[in-house]
Amino acid sequence: PVLQTLRGHRDSLQAVKISPNGKWLASGGYDQTIKLWDLETGQELRTLLGHNGAVFDLSFRADSRLLASASGDRTIKLWDVATGQRLDTLNQSLMELYCVAFSPDGRRLAAGGVDNRIRIWTISDSGQEGSNPLEVSQFAHELPVLRIAYAPDGQTLVSSSEDRLIKIWNAQSMTIRSTLAEQADWVVGLAVHPRQPSLLAGRLDGTITRLDLPAPATATDTPLTPLSDVVTAMDYGAQPALEELPRVTESEPNDEASQPTALTVPGVALGVIQTADGRAKDEDLWAFEARQGDQWIIETNARRLKSPVDTKIEVLDESGKAVPRLLLRAVRDSEIEFRSMDSNQRGVRLKYWEELLLNDYVYLNGEVIKHYQQRRGPDADGQFYPENGNRHAFFDTTCRTHALGEPAYVVVPYPVGTTLPNNGLPVFTLNYENDDDGQRKLGADSRLTFVAPATGKYLVRVSDVRGFAGADYRYELIVRRPRPDFTVTLTGANPTVNAGSGKEFTVKAERADLFAGPIQVDVTGLPPGFHVTSPVVIQPGLHEARGVISAAADAPAPTEANWAQTKITATGRWGDKTIVKEVNSLGTIKLGPKPKVLVHLQLDQPANALAERAPQEPAVVTIVPGRRASCRLRIERLEFKDRVQLEVFNLPHGVIVEDIGLNGVLIPEEQTERTIFLSCEPWVPAMERLFHAVAKVDGDQVSLPLQIRVVSPTEPVR
C-alpha cells in the first residue's frame, strides 16, 4: 500500500534518496531544487536552492550529515542536511553531471556525467569550501556515465554508461577489474548487494537483471609500475674523448637493412645524405652490436658543422623494424584551447586544466611534454618544463608546433609488453627515434638515449626529415657511452644589499647525459654581518634554485678582502661517485642604506608572528602532502605608501601559494600584512627547504627565509 504521497516539486523528479539514519528523504529534479522531507511525518523540512540546472542524482554521506547533489549545471554541491546550508561547490566538470555517490566511509565522493569521466574528491569531515580537493579524474567510458555505485566494503566501484557497458573498478586505484557483457539498453539504475557479490542493474527498457560482481582480489588489481623519463645511468668508467673515438666513413649502398655500414662503438660515423643512381632520397644505415641493458647516447653533429641536413635518427632491429621504447597509456583526454602552441613556448592552455597535476605527462601529436606549473587562473597559461627557456620534450620526442583545438592526452609511461586494461583511450607506442634534440642543447641536430632491450645487432638509420639530399649534406653520427655530469652558474652577482634586508640570487644547473640527481650549492666565508641561505639545493630533475644574501641592520661595510674569502661549490652524486664543481662567485657586494620597505616572512601564529629569528635559525612551517599550511607576509613601510606586490620563491616543487592571481600576492595601500596558504601535492617527498619572499618594489627587497618541512602523514607535526 502507498504509505505517503509527497508533493512539492514543480517538474519531473530525477532523484530520490533516503538518508542512512532513516529519518529523511531527499528529492531533486528538473525544477532545479532539492527538497528534504521528514520520512515519519511526510512534512517538507526545507528546500535547497543553488543549482542552475536539473538535479539528476543525490547521495547522503553515511553519517547523514552531508548531502551531495549532481546537476546539469556541471557542478556537484555539498549541503549541510541539518541547516540546508550549501557547504561547497565542486566545479571541475565542463559538462553535465548525471550521478554522484559517497563511499561507505564517507571520505570520498565519486561523480560522473557527459564528459565520460569519473571524478573522485576527498571530502573533509566538515565539507566546508576549500577542504574537498579533487583526487582523481579518470576517463571511464566512451559515452556519458549514467550511474555509479560503491560496494559496501568501499573497495569496489561500479559504473554504467550510454555505451551499454558496466565496468567494475578498484575504488582506491581506479584501475579496471572487469567489464561486463554489453547490456540490452542503457543501465540507469545500479545497486550493489549488501552481503553477496552481486549487483542489480535496471535498464531503460524496463528490465532488471542480477549480475555477478567479480571478487576484489584479481590480477588486474596489481598496481602497474610507470617508467621514469630519466634512465638511471650506469657507470662505464673513464671514457675516451670525442676526438679519440674511432671513425668510419659510410660505404654506399647502405639504404637497406641488408646493407648497413658496420660501426664499432663507441665510435663516430661519417656520412652524406645524397642521392645517386636515380634514387628519390637517401637513408644511411649503420650497424652496431649491443648487449641487453647497454646504454648508448646516439647523436648527430650536422647543423653545428654548418651542414644543411636536418637529421632524423631511428634505432631499428636487424631486420629493419623500429625498436619500441615504451608505451604511453592515455588516462584523460584534453585539447589545446585559446590559441595554438609553437615549438618553443612553455605555456599553453589545455581543456580540463584544473585536473592536470604537476609532473603529469601530456602527449601532443608525437611530442611528450611535462607539466611544471599550474595556471594561475582561467586567463593564464599552464607552464611546462623546464623552469625557464624553451620548452623541453621528454622521452627523446621532438618539440613541434600544435594547432588550436588539437587533441591532447594525459599519459602514463609503461614498459613495452605491459598488459594495459582498455579504458577507452588510446595507447601510444614510442619508438627509439628523434628529429631535434628534445632537451634543446643540439639545436636541429638529433639525440636519443638507447637502452638495448636484448643482446644483438641494431641499426641506426640517419635521414633528412624533409627528404632533402645533396653532396654537402654531411653529418657525423656519434654513438658513445653516457657521461653524467653538470655545471652550475650563479646569476645575481655584485648586488647592493640594503642594511636590514636581503637580495636574491639564482643558481642554474646545466645537466648532461642522464645526470638527474639533486645538486647542493654551499656558500662559505661571508664577511661579518652578512648571511646567505646555504646550502641551496637544486632538486632532482630541476635546473635552478634561489637563495638570499642578507645584511644585518648594523653590518659593517665589507672590503674586497672580505669577499675574496667567499667560496661557492656545487656537489652532486652519481651512483657511488661524488662530483664537486666550483661555482662563480657572488662578486663584489656593496652595502646599501636601509630600504623604503622591509619584508618579513613569518609563522601564522599570533604569539610569535612578530618574533624575529637569527638568519641561521629560521622558523619552521610544517606541511603534510595533500594538505595546506599557512604563513604570514608582513611589511614595514618606512618610506613607501603604495601597494606592494610580492612573490614567494624557492618552495619545494609541488608546493604552491594558493589563490595569488596573475600579479602574485598583493598588500594594498595602508595595509601591512597578509596570510598566505601553501598547498602541497600528494607526491611531494619528505624534505626541508628554505624559502623566501620578494617585494617587487624598491629594488626587489627580500625577506629572511622560512624553512618548510614536508612530513609524511604518519609523522607527527611539530
Label the predicted regions.
Residues 1, 34-37, 76-79, 118-122, ...:
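WD40-repeat beta-propellers
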Residues 7-13, 49-55, 91-97, 138-145, ...:
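WD40/WD-repeat beta-propeller blade N-cap
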Residues 20-21, 62-63, 104-105, 152-153, ...:
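Residue-level detector of Asp-centered blade-edge/turn motifs that repeat once per structural unit
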Residues 28-31, 70-73, 112-115, 160-163, ...:
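Conserved strand-to-loop turn within each blade of WD40 beta-propeller repeats
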Residues 39-42, 81-84, 123-126, 171-174, ...:
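Short loop/turn segments that connect beta-strands within beta-propeller blades
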Residues 255, 264-474, 478-526, 530-533, ...:
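Acidic, Ser/Thr/Pro-rich low-complexity intrinsically disordered segments
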